Structures are given as C-alpha cells and as structure tokens.
Amino acid sequence: MIIVLAILAGIIGIAGSILPGLPGTPVSWIGLLLLYIWGPEDMALKTLIIWGVVVAIVSVVDYIVPMYFTKLTGGSKYAERGAIVGLIAGIILTPVGMILGSFLGAFLFELYYTRQGAAQALKAAIGSFLGFITGTGLKTIVAVLILWKIFVFAF
C-alpha cells in the first residue's frame, strides 16, 4: 500500500509541476519520504535530504525565473500577472491552451496596462513565456527524477 501511495505522490507531483495550483515537486518528495519511513528497501537519509534540498531550490527558482526573464525583456509585473491569468484560463483548452494562454495573457496585460505599444508587449510576453517554460521544465524534470527514484527504492 505504501508503494502505491508513493507512486501516486510521484505522479501527482509530475501533474502539479505542469498544472498551476497543484503542488508539484513537494508532493513527489513526500512519495520519497513515505518510502524512507515505511518502504521495503533501505534509503539513506542523505538521499532524502539531497532531494529535499533540490525540491526547495527548484521551488524558489520557479518563482524567480519568470520574473527574471520578464525583466530581461523589459516587461512589467503586468506581463507576469497576465501570463498566470492566461495560463489558468488556458487550462480549459488543454496543454496547448495553457501555453498560448500564458503568452497571450502576458501580451494583453502588458499592452493594456503599460500602453508602451505592441512591440514592447510582444517582447515582454516572450520573456514571460520563456520564464514560465523554464520554471515548468525544471520542476517537471525534478518530479520525473523523483518518481524514478521512487521506483528504484520501491522495487
């Protein structure tokens, strides 16, 4: 039963790395924690701590990277907020909708609120989008690696 819960936590962690509003990598790490406490194979505390630190770092980086990319391209906080609003609205339209929604949200918010023109809004939207993709990619990679570790320690 613990193995099933650990694997389920790993899968939910991957989904949460992609979908906004769901915790991602921390849930994956909980799967490792379950196996550390009750798993069939001995896992070193060092392994659990290292993955915990990786999860903490990726969680912080996920908040910093979109802001960095947006500012790098001259965007404002409105582009960041628009990307989040567009992403959430795009969930209804599948993963493609999430990506397009994030981009369009950043573009429209930047265009409307800063009134600096379409060229600047486009640059900000590209920066916000690249930041979102980078953060999501990092979280997803870590969540997949943790799920792999869960399988290694479970079987």
Please name every model-derived segment:
Residues G10-V27, G86-G97:
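Transmembrane alpha-helix interface/packing and boundary motifs in multi-pass membrane proteins
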Residues M1-L8, P26-V27, T73-I84, Q120-A125:
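Short hydrophobic alpha-helical membrane-embedded segments
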Residues G13-G16, L35, V54-Y63, G90-T94, ...:
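Alpha-helical transmembrane segments of multi-pass membrane proteins
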Residues M1, A15-L22, P66-K77, Y113-A119:
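Short, amphipathic, aromatic/basic-enriched membrane-interface segments that mark the entry/exit
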Residues Y113-F155:
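C-terminal binding/interaction regions
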Residues M1-V4, I37-I50, V152-F155:
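Helix-coil boundary and interhelical linker segments in multi-pass alpha-helical membrane proteins
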Residues K46, I50-G90:
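Helix-adjacent hinge/juxtasegments
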Residues V27-M43, V85-L93, L104-Y113:
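Interfacial segments of multi-pass membrane proteins
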